[in-house]
Amino acid sequence: MYGIEYSTILTFLISLVFINYLLKSVTRTMDFIIYRFLMIVVLLAPIIKAQNYGINLPITGSMDTPYTNSTMSETFLTSTLCLYYPNEAATEIADTKWKETLSQLLLTKGWPTGSVYFKGYADIASFSVEPQLYCDYNIVLMKYDANLQLDMSELADLILNEWLCNPMDITLYYYQQTDEANKWISMGSSCTIKVCPLNTQTLGIGCSTTDTNSFETVANAEKLVITDVVDGVNHKLDVTTNTCTIRNCKKLGPRENVAVIQVGGSNVLDITADPTTAPQTERMMRVNWKKWWQVFYTIVDYVNQIVQAMSKRSRSLNSAAFYYRV
């Protein structure tokens, strides 16, 4: 009997020793993992910077108030500035060093020469097909043309606002716009857009779904089209898809790092007629048209006032980014 009790006690003691050894081994292993992880974090922390998304715009509610979401403070002078101008400006100036001259003048306003970029574009139509706004602050000069008021207004609406867009398959599906912020945006070398509104039985209202010639033409051979139809009504669309792409888009709010300067014209183009566009005339401005040198001198003089009406953003805009998330 005593032998059995001794064996039980011995087994119990051996188990305690084994468990104690096991716990110490686990503790050492965990300490090793934790210390190594902390060491890696400490080593990488100085070279890793959190992404700065600039401004948060709420998906619902008021779009007027931006909320700061900056993870680091940067000196104003470290920002980049892009100035977009029509190619005719460079042609009229006819000076190979005009950009260097403007860079030196902007330096007097506090903008280092390496932070300012000049980008020309052929015309409003071609610029609207592939807008590329990559700088922290982007100023777009558009020379007023009475024959291009609609194109100028649509381009301003596109680049002064953020859009969330998805592809449309018009061969398989009908589409409807859910509210005033919902638009169909088309881009391409030639966009002709026709629509046929449908009733609840999917029969055409004033048109035949099998005859595209009976569709209503809302745009003809344009490069940029922002289409607005009656909300809550299904539509069958006909689009020149070989030369144009169309996306179903939702206007999210203002793109605060872009300003449009209208060169010439009696009044600033009004893009606020759309109920979804908050008044933003402070970022849609006009300068008197004289000569391009005079225009650029005016921009240099007021560049800091213009930038103060904007907000620095980290998100760039190009045609691909526009289509899926701006």
Curated annotation (Swiss-Prot):
Function: Calcium-binding protein that interacts with rotavirus cell receptors once the initial attachment by VP4 has been achieved. Rotavirus attachment and entry into the host cell probably involves multiple sequential contacts between the outer capsid proteins VP4 and VP7, and the cell receptors. Following entry into the host cell, low intracellular or intravesicular Ca(2+) concentration probably causes the calcium-stabilized VP7 trimers to dissociate from the virion. This step is probably necessary for the membrane-disrupting entry step and the release of VP4, which is locked onto the virion by VP7.
One cellular component (GO) term of this entry: host cell endoplasmic reticulum lumen
InterPro entries: VP7 (IPR001963), VP7_1 (IPR042207), VP7_2 (IPR042210)
Family: Belongs to the rotavirus VP7 family.
Keyword Membrane set for record: no
Region (CNP motif): 165-167
Region annotation (LVD motif) ranges: 237-239
Residue ranges, annotated region (GPR motif): 253-255
Quaternary state and interactors: Homotrimer; disulfide-linked. 2 Ca(2+) ions bound at each subunit interface in the trimer hold the trimer together. Interacts with the intermediate capsid protein VP6. Interacts with the outer capsid protein VP5*.
Native species: Rotavirus A (isolate RVA/Pig/Australia/TFR-41/1987/G5P9[7])
A GO molecular function held by the record: metal ion binding
Glycosylation sites: 69
Localization annotation: Virion; Host endoplasmic reticulum lumen
Residues that span the membrane, as ranges: none
Note: Some rotavirus strains are neuraminidase-sensitive and require sialic acid to attach to the cell surface. Some rotavirus strains are integrin-dependent. Some rotavirus strains depend on ganglioside for their entry into the host cell. Hsp70 also seems to be involved in the entry of some strains. In group A rotaviruses, VP7 defines the G serotype.
Record key words, sorted: Calcium, Capsid protein, Disulfide bond, Glycoprotein, Host endoplasmic reticulum, Host-virus interaction, Metal-binding, Outer capsid protein, Signal, T=13 icosahedral capsid protein, Virion
Residues binding Ca(2+) 2: 177, 228-229, 231, 301
Disulfide bridges in this chain: 82-135, 165-249, 191-244, 196-207
Protein name (record): Outer capsid glycoprotein VP7
Domain of life: Viruses
Span of the signal peptide: 1-50
Residues that bind Ca(2+) 1: 95, 206, 214, 216
Major place of residence: virion
PTM comment: N-glycosylated.
